[in-house]
């Protein structure tokens, strides 16, 4: 199973997280850097099964928290929809 590890210490602003996701998951240049595009990539582009590991995602300022929660929710929703293909692990 392919494992993608995302550490909160890798970026300052939430918007940067999409670029990290794009790089680590090998997403194409046309990836739209939004939750809908992430869902599309997760369910039709990347090889599965895979595990998404989120390390250190906890207390955030309000802006980062709301923005990051959309991304994390996307990962969790994909896991719920396709439990045989995706696993999300959070390490605080």
Per-range role (PLM):
Residues 1-30, 45-92:
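N-terminal intrinsically disordered, low-complexity segments enriched in P/E/S/T
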Residues 41-43:
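Short, intrinsically disordered low-complexity segments
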Residues 33-34:
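Short glycine-rich substrate-engagement loop in P-loop NTPases that contacts/grips substrate
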């Amino acid at each position: 199973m392919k494992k993608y590890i995302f550490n909160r210490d890798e970026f300052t602003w939430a918007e940067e997280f999409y670029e990290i996701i794009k790089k680590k998951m090998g997403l194409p240049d046309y990836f739209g850097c939004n939750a809908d595009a992430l869902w599309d990539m997760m369910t039709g582009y990347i090889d599965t099964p895979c595990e998404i590991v989120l390390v250190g995602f906890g207390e955030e300022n309000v802006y980062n928290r709301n923005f990051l929660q959309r991304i994390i929710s996307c990962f969790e929703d994909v896991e719920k929809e396709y439990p045989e293909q995706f696993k999300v692990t959070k390490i605080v």
